[in-house]
Amino acid sequence: MSTHYIAGQWRPGQGAPLQSLDPVSQAVVWQGQGASAAQVDEAVNAARGAFSLWAAHSLDGRIAVLERFAAALKSHADELARAIGEETGKPLWEAATEVTSMVNKVAISIQSYRERTGEKSGPLADATAVLRHKPHGVVAVFGPYNFPGHLPNGHIVPALLAGNCVLFKPSELTPKVAELTVKCWIEAGLPAGVLNLLQGGRETGVALAGHPGIDGLFFTGSSRTGNLLHAQFAGRPDKILALEMGGNNPLIVDQVADIDAAVYTIVQSAFISAGQRCTCARRLLVPQGQWGDALLARLVQVAGQLKVGRFDEQPAPFMGSVISLQAAAQLMQAQADLLAKGATALLAMTQPQADAALLTPGILDVTAVSERPDEEFFGPLLQVIRYSDFDGAIAEANTTAFGLAAGLLSDSKARYEQFWLHSRAGIVNWNKQLTGAASTAPFGGIGASGNHRASAYYAADYCAYPVASLESEALTLPTTLTPGVTL
């Protein structure tokens, strides 16, 4: 099978065998072989060879290619959505929204480039001060499995717009989505070598991340891998590194008037995408007492009735599967570990079929657990912590090395202002689901959640570097010379 796209040609892989599976049926969706180190080298050289012409291409010319890419995505939307559903397990309705986000990223990136990294000038004494931006050169993009189209697209589109050439290494769990996306770029007329696709697992990733021919790496994925990349790039100020690594996100519930509105927002925050969004709520902070008890009882009732099913099931499920049987097993083990440490199951997460990666929502009260792990349990497992006062709830919310998202459900603006002031997160929401974000806002966090603001409006900032110039069309002698100089 032709697995990789290098220098404008589809090539079979020379590395380890690779296949993606439908996480529910375990049917093979895609198969091939990963890229070898030699093929990584070939792809880097192809990108390096294409860079000068692509960077010299006019901005309008690059925009035209991007807009044709958006048109290709629209024309293949159903095929892409089905591939996303097949490989990730997310319901078709949700997969379709991901394709829409991919399309919209083009216009957003163009607007962002013009506003944040376009050309600006102004008079300065007898010269003109000009700010322009240049592409870094050849950059690697490592994509995640949870949004295999949208999230790598959020790096690739602004990188190409800025004039970079790209080496795209998708998750080894979602190669089909990556292949279809690259075919849309080909349909758009992207020149050979400007975008190269390298499928593969660890072997391919290590070879690409360590290649001396790349000028930077843009990564969305696990904290573990992101930390390894950060250590690898330490001491290399000549290379740009952008990381988005998820979080252990808190959602505080104040005593609100509308319990059902709170429950619905919690469900959307914790269990959308089967809990496989980096901004999903992992910790729910609920006040002690009768009102908090009533909220949790209603939450357990609603969460226990959520429809879970295969991606193309009709009527459509709210939740699909997690990405793999291995991921399901790890989540079930995480629940068992928390229960062994003293947690109480308000709603036990279950795996109805041993041979399918479908999990039902889990809600555990971990208030009594003295040493709660500061980990991102990437699935439908929500931890509840009861609090006695609002100051204590904010302090508890901040007890994490991560800092991606935090939220508050409250009828009090004063409490939200207090929460916003003291929250340690890059995304802070009030009375909105934690997974919600504006496309024109930066996306990312602080601490162990990463650096820069990956794959969103501020992606333009790390896809090009600023060049400041003082310019004058004529070389003239100043009327007053510097003291000590005689001409």
Swiss-Prot record:
In the UniProt entry, which residues are flagged as the active site? 244, 278
Q: In which pathway does it act?
A: Amino-acid degradation; L-arginine degradation via AST pathway; L-glutamate and succinate from L-arginine: step 4/5
Please list the GO biological process terms of this entry.
arginine catabolic process to glutamate; arginine catabolic process to succinate
Keyword list, A-Z: Arginine metabolism, NAD, Oxidoreductase
Binding of NAD(+), residues: 221-226
Per its UniProt record, what Gene3D superfamilies does this chain match?
Aldehyde Dehydrogenase, Chain A, domain 1, Aldehyde Dehydrogenase, Chain A, domain 2
Query: GO molecular function terms here?
Result: succinylglutamate-semialdehyde dehydrogenase activity
One Pfam family of this chain: Aldedh
- Can you say what this protein is called? N-succinylglutamate 5-semialdehyde dehydrogenase
Q: What's the EC number here?
A: 1.2.1.71
What is catalysed by this protein? N-succinyl-L-glutamate 5-semialdehyde + NAD(+) + H2O = N-succinyl-L-glutamate + NADH + 2 H(+)
What is the superkingdom listed in this entry's lineage?
A: Bacteria
Q: What does this protein do?
A: Catalyzes the NAD-dependent reduction of succinylglutamate semialdehyde into succinylglutamate.
Gene designation per UniProt: astD
* Family to which the UniProt record says this protein belongs: Belongs to the aldehyde dehydrogenase family. AstD subfamily.
Which residues does UniProt assign to the signal peptide? none
- The question of whether Magnesium is a record keyword is answered with no
